[in-house]
């Protein structure tokens, strides 16, 4: 049953892309033209289901899916040269709304979602439009409140 539901959700998402009504086409355009700090958030598209977060390092974008349906896209800032954001599949290990870095002089890491125990997390931070972090994935403050 799980495979059937997954295929159905995936096919539904693909179907929307192929049929692309004007409103959906506008959303796709908006995703490509987001400026640093901008995001879209539409939780009503899929009110329940497992959540997956995909970080595109080349595009400096974070995509949030719930129940196999994309509900949000945001700009981000990943690791700068020498501090690259690791790639792979991670589980959120810890959440802390008011976290402070133990590595970088108590630097604030609002709405922190820890990915590794050696300091990699999703959190709110500065978004210059290019990779600039020490390996974390920086998000807009308001977007980080939803993740």
Predicted regions and their residues:
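N-terminal pre-domains immediately preceding structured catalytic cores
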Residues: 2-112, 117-147
């Amino acid at each position: 049953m799980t495979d059937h539901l997954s295929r159905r959700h995936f096919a539904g998402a693909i179907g929307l892309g192929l049929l692309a009504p004007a409103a959906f086409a506008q959303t796709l355009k908006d995703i490509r033209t987001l400026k640093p700090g901008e995001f879209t958030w539409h939780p009503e598209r899929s009110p329940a289901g497992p959540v997956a977060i995909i970080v595109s390092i080349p595009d400096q974008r974070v995509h949030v899916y719930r129940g196999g349906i994309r509900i949000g896209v945001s700009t981000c800032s990943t690791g700068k040269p020498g501090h690259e954001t690791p790639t792979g599949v991670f589980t959120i290990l810890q959440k802390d709304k008011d976290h402070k870095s133990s590595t970088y002089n108590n630097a604030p890491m609002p709405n922190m979602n820890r990915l590794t125990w050696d300091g990699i997390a999703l959190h709110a931070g500065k978004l210059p439009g290019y990779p600039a972090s020490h390996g974390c994935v920086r998000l807009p403050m308001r977007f980080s409140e939803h993740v």
